[in-house]
């Protein structure tokens, strides 16, 4: 599934609460997360930042890139399950959707390493994540987006996915 040009602008709007790059302190992030919440991170920087704050995402989706430049992969020695998929920029592949769905039934923490680009994988994550999970991803040049999975969020991302089909 490819991202049509007319959807690009829509996806620039955060799906959830935006924590500004100028205000990335631990309290602002932690107060949005309860201890028993399933936490999913999409993006190398987001994953790395959460690990540095002492948070352990149950699912981490990374691609070894930041703003399309090679970067060091975040270190996490607690990973129990490693998965991988191929997902070209501007697309959501069937393979990546299946791997994301599978990740929710694997022993956590799960790390999915994407060959390609992980940015759009926030969409299938929001569809498959358990109710009330927290999904975090970076909003380029703005900050961190924190999404709580609700029926409304699922409906919103499903519409986006339907348009991409």
Language model: regions and residue ranges:
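A polyampholytic, Gly/Pro-enriched intrinsically disordered region
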Residues: 80-89, 156-165
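Short, flexible loop segments at boundaries between secondary-structure elements
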Residues: 138-153, 165
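Gly/Ser/Thr-rich loops at beta-strand to alpha-helix junctions
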Residues: 40-48, 115-122, 141-142
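Hydrophobic/aromatic-rich, well-ordered segments within soluble, folded domains that form packed cores
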Residues: 107-137
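Short, solvent-exposed amphipathic alpha-helical segments in soluble enzyme
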Residues: 51-59, 75-77, 126-131, 150-154, ...
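Short hydrophobic/aromatic-enriched beta-strand-loop microsegments
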Residues: 57-64, 131-139
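N-terminal, charge-rich interaction modules
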Residues: 1-88
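Internal catalytic-core helix/loop-beta-alpha segment
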Residues: 82-114, 120
């Amino acid at each position: 599934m490819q991202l049509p040009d007319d959807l690009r602008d829509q996806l620039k709007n955060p799906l959830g609460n935006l924590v500004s790059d100028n205000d990335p302190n631990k309290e602002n992030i932690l107060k949005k997360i309860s201890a028993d919440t399933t936490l999913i991170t999409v993006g190398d920087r987001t994953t790395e930042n959460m690990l540095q704050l002492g948070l352990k995402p149950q699912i981490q989706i990374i691609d070894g890139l930041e703003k399309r430049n090679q970067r060091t992969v975040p270190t996490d020695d607690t990973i129990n399950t490693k998965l991988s998929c191929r997902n070209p920029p501007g697309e959501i592949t069937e393979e990546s959707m299946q791997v994301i769905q599978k990740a929710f039934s694997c022993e956590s923490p799960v790390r999915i390493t994407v060959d390609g680009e992980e940015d759009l994988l926030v969409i299938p994550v929001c569809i498959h994540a358990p109710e009330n999970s927290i999904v975090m991803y970076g909003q380029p040049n703005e900050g961190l987006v924190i999404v709580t999975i609700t029926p409304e969020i699922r409906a919103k991302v499903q519409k986006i996915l339907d348009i991409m089909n």
